[in-house]
Design a protein with these regions (language model features):
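Amphipathic alpha-helical "coupling" segments that flank catalytic cores
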Residues: 1-696
């Protein structure tokens, strides 16, 4: 067995898709060859992806697939063999279609219990790698996640083909030998191209294992992850030399990795006067427009220096590159400074009226109309949270005003952030300005939550207005489609209620949102569906945080209004299940639930001690009365784990009750009294969670 290399050398590939394209191409080739039995168990696949190439290296590849014994079912005997013992036309046709040529006597007869069937057992000859690789390449190309196809003309001037970008060379080597395949009008060979600017002649790849070394000699680093690691390490090194730290967002690192074949880091700078502009504006300008890495000093303050990733090895040490990029960024930052200076000439409050001209949703009105609804919800949320109502109302009114500014018009990512700066410039109260920034939080999974009660009130109002409104017009998420990010909004509400331990009812908040939304034409009351949606998101969130399906179901079965204590309930249930009494009590609890479900009408919880006849029911009643006060006190204190430990003491009397007492006694009074005892017991046992859901 020998190692295989395949490379498609292309024009520049779309950077944001390069990693996926590289991995998918390698996996497609690997899977197809593995399915055709060209690979060994020891085969290792390595994907390569650079701006102008997709490649895959696979170890331990066979030059020819092994012969394969196979067994083919044909037709029933009664269909395939005539009365004369010869093959019928139906059998002859079937065998011809499968390429089988043998005598009827060579076929095997097998009784499958219904019919006697004819089978053929033969040997399928192995095929050369060229055939297998041809199919593998076609399969891999067909299954690539191509964001947008480009159609281009081949060298013959007639034929057109479609691919993500034009392919210029096709390399296919098994060891040192060329594997003859054809793709995109190209015949395979060993030639490829190196760096666009630092090499000029084609490169002949000597063998599959020399690919990486030869490409590096031609100033191409084909391994995507290696390039990224080099970029990240060099950025950190250059930043440290300046006693600074580079701001390296994940998406920017990925993009520059996909844009460079041979990364080289250079330093540049801009005039310090631009530092008067909020640093978020400067950083975003550098990242989005120029792909620069901004630098912060040790105190977290933005510096007027930055790092950039090039793929040119400059003869002058990068002086011209640095100066050129300084000129480019100067123009960009001048625009940002202009926007900032112009925006501050008008107060946020003066921009609120302009929200009438900003469409929120064609069925839900303008941002101005939405702002009025958010203010109503924020007032209710502030009352429930004990937040400053005046400041919450002010923040809700101004929260979207920065949508009318030049800066946010240019950089929508800065909405809320610029609102805070402009509010501070207008001398708004500190918590009002902060709430304008924080009401968008959490923007994504793991993002920080709003930090003040005013911010929380406005953030809850903003997200709940979105949810109640869009649910009200039927814009629910479906499958993977969630164009309005409603799952993220719901998760944000849940995180705020739980992680901030807010003593607030979720249904009460939803009711407040509905009161603000109900007068919008065409909006229907979908509160029940919205609560179910929240329950589903909460279940997913709990599972992601380590709760088992049973633990989550047990707690959520309580249909809790207030969610702040859910983590403690999950922890209590988990600890309870480690107790030796847990298995018996959960089984008994499930049994009690089934008994109570079968009762027609309402079951009273009023127990008449005089009707307790059996020793076991008397004992259970006394034990329950002894446990109840302590259990209720522990529950009131939120000590759920201790409460469940306390009720674990009921295991023995519960077991004895079911062993000796007939619940459905013939005497109606006795039966009702025993059901009342069980209902009261059931209520105590399930105060923290519905523990029957934990039964095995």
């Amino acid at each position: 067995m020998t190692n295989l290399l395949v490379e498609l050398q292309t024009e520049e590939l779309p950077p944001k898709a390069l990693r996926k394209l590289s991995e998918a191409f390698a996996e497609g080739v690997r899977k197809s060859l593995a399915d055709a039995h060209f690979l060994a168990d020891s085969s290792v696949t390595t994907a390569y992806g650079a701006p102008r190439r997709l490649a895959v290296h696979i170890t331990d590849v066979l030059a020819k697939s092994p012969d394969e014994t196979f067994r083919q079912k044909l037709v029933p005997v009664k269909v395939g063999i005539g009365a004369d013992g010869q093959a019928t036309p139906a059998l002859v046709k079937k065998m011809a279609a499968l390429g089988i040529n043998c005598a009827v006597t060579d076929l095997e007869r097998v009784d499958d219990g219904k019919n006697e069937q004819l089978y053929y057992e033969g040997v399928r000859q192995g095929v050369e790698l060229a055939s297998g690789l041809q199919h593998a390449l076609e399969y891999a190309v067909k299954h690539l996640p191509i964001p947008k196809v480009m159609t281009y003309q081949l060298a013959d001037g007639v034929t057109t083909v479609s691919f993500v970008r034009p392919v210029r060379h096709l390399t296919a080597l098994l060891g040192t030998e060329i594997v003859p395949v054809e793709l995109f009008g190209l015949k395979s060979g060993r030639l490829t191209r190196g760096h666009r600017f630092h090499t000029s002649e084609p490169i002949a790849i000597e063998n599959a294992d020399s690919y990486v070394e030869q490409m590096k000699a031609a100033f191409v680093m084909p391994c995507y992850d290696e390039r990224r690691a080099v970029i990240e390490a060099e950025l950190k090194r250059r930043a440290a030399a300046l006693d600074a730290e580079a701001i390296m967002p994940e998406d920017l690192l990925e993009e520059v990795t996909a844009l460079t074949e041979w990364p080289v880091i250079y330093e540049s700078q801009f005039e310090s006067e631009f530092l008067a502009v909020p640093q978020e504006c400067l950083i975003l300008t550098m990242q989005l427009n120029q792909k620069y890495f901004a630098l912060e000093d040790r105190s977290g303050k933005l510096m007027n220096r930055f790092l950039l990733v090039s793929q040119l090895i400059a003869k002058d040490g990068g002086k011209a590159i640095s100066e050129g990029n300084a000129r480019v960024v100067r123009a960009r930052l001048a625009d940002a400074k202009f926007f900032y200076d112009q925006d501050r000439m008008h107060t946020l409050e003066s921009r609120v009226e302009g929200l009438r001209h900003v469409v929120y949703h064609n069925k839900l009105g303008s941002q101005y109309e939405r702002m009025l609804r958010v203010r109503r919800i924020a007032a209710a949320a502030a009352a429930l949270l004990g937040a400053n109502k005046t400041e919450a109302d002010r923040a809700a009114m101004l929260a979207k005003a920065d949508l009318r500014t030049l800066m946010v018009g240019e950089f929508p990512e800065l909405q809320g952030i610029m609102g805070e700066y402009y509010a501070e410039n207008d001398k708004e109260p500190k918590d009002v300005a902060l709430a304008i920034r924080e009401h968008y939080q959490p923007r994504y999974a793991g993002d920080a939550l709003p930090s003040t009660s005013v911010s929380l009130a406005v953030a809850l109002a903003d997200k709940l207005e979105t949810l109640i409104g869009l649910f009200g017009i039927g814009q629910l998420p479906t499958g993977e489609k969630d164009p309005f990010a409603l799952r993220r909004h719901a998760l944000g509400v849940l995180r705020m209620l739980i992680e901030k331990e807010l003593d607030v009812s979720l249904p009460a908040l939803i009711d407040a949102a509905w009161e603000a939304e109900k007068d919008v034409a065409g909006v229907v009351d979908n509160r029940r569906e919205l609560l179910t949606f929240f329950a589903d998101r909460l279940r997913v969130m709990l599972r992601e945080r380590g709760a088992t399906a049973q633990e989550a179901d047990a707690v959520l079965a309580k249909r809790l209004d207030k969610l702040a204590d859910i983590p403690k309930r999950i922890g209590a249930v988990r600890a309870f299940m480690d107790l030796p009494e847990a298995e018996a009590l959960t089984a008994a609890n499930k049994r009690i639930g089934n008994i109570l479900k079968k009762v027609e009408g309402e079951v009273s919880e009023k127990i008449d001690p005089a009707l307790l006849q059996e020793a076991a029911e008397k004992n259970l009643f006394e034990e329950l009365r002894a446990v109840e006060p302590a259990a209720e006190a522990l529950y009131a204190e939120g000590r759920f784990e201790d409460m469940l430990v306390t009720i674990a003491a009921l295991r023995s009397p519960v077991d004895a009750f079911f062993e000796t007492v007939m619940v459905n006694a013939e005497d109606p009074a006795l039966r009702a009294n025993r059901l009342a005892l069980l209902k009261r017991l059931y209520g105590v046992m399930n105060a923290v969670a519905e523990i029957s859901r934990l039964a095995k």
